[in-house]
C-alpha cells in the first residue's frame, strides 16, 4: 500500500512554551518523520498542527496544517484571538411576550420566580438546538437592540425564556445569542462555563445556516 500521510495532534498545543508534554510528542513525531525519509521510497505528507499549534509552533507546519476553530475566528489565547475575526453569528426571533406578575413562576420545575411584575419573552431555541441547560438561571444572556437580556429559569428542549422587563421589544424582533463584533461565541460560551468549540459544533440541524461570502 502507498502511505499518503502521517499526522499527530498535540495534546496541549495552547500551553505556554516550553511545554514538556508537547516537546516529547514533537520529538517522537520528528523521529518517525526521519525514519520515513530514510526508509520509504515515496515520502508521505506530514502534519501536526491544529489552530493553536499554528500560532504556538509556526516552525512546525510541515506539509500542511489543520485549522479548525481558527476559521471561525478563535485560537484559544487572547493574543492569538486578536489576530483573527470571529465570523459566526447566531440570531433568533421573539415568538411570544407575556406579562408575569410578581411571585409567578416561569419554566419547568418552577425554575424562576418573578421578583417583581415582569415581562418575559420566549425564544424558539433550546437544548435540542445546542443551547444547553447550563445557560439557564441568569447564567446566559442574549442581546435585543443592543441591550442585554438574561435567560431565566430552565432552558427547555425547544425554547427558552428571557427577561425583557426593561427592554422595548415585540414579537418577531431579532435576538442575538452571539455575534461577530460583540458577545462572540467565545464570550457566550463562557457564560455557561463552556468553550467556543462546544457551542459552535453543537448547534443543531434545525438552525438555518446562511453563508455570506
What are these regions (language model features)?
Residues 1-93, 100-101:
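Active-site loop/helix belt of alpha/beta enzymes
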Residues 8-13, 49-53, 88, 92-95, ...:
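Small-side-chain structural scaffolding
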Residues 99-213:
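C-terminal accessory subdomain/extension
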Amino acid at each position: 500500500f502507498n502511505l499518503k500521510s502521517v499526522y499527530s495532534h498535540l495534546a496541549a498545543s495552547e500551553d505556554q512554551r516550553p511545554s514538556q508534554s508537547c516537546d516529547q510528542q514533537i520529538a517522537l513525531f520528528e523521529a518517525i518523520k526521519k525514519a520515513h525519509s530514510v526508509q520509504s521510497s515515496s515520502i508521505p505528507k506530514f502534519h501536526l498542527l491544529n489552530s493553536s499549534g499554528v500560532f504556538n509552533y509556526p516552525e512546525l507546519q510541515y506539509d500542511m496544517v489543520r485549522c479548525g476553530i481558527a476559521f471561525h475566528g478563535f485560537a484559544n489565547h487572547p493574543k492569538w484571538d486578536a489576530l483573527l475575526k470571529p465570523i459566526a453569528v447566531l440570531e433568533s426571533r421573539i415568538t411570544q411576550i407575556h406579562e408575569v406578575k410578581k411571585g409567578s413562576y416561569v419554566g419547568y420545575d418552577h425554575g424562576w420566580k418573578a421578583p417583581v411584575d415582569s415581562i418575559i419573552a420566549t425564544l424558539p431555541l433550546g437544548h435540542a438546538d445546542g443551547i444547553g441547560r447550563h445557560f439557564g438561571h441568569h447564567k446566559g444572556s442574549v442581546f435585543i437592540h443592543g441591550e442585554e437580556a438574561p435567560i431565566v429559569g430552565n432552558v427547555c428542549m425547544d425554547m427558552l425564556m428571557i427577561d425583557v422587563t426593561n427592554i422595548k421589544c415585540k414579537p418577531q424582533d431579532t435576538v442575538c445569542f452571539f455575534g461577530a463584533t460583540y458577545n462572540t461565541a467565545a464570550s457566550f460560551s463562557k457564560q455557561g462555563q463552556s468553550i467556543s468549540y462546544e457551542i459552535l459544533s453543537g448547534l443543531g440541524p434545525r438552525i438555518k445556516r446562511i453563508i455570506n461570502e
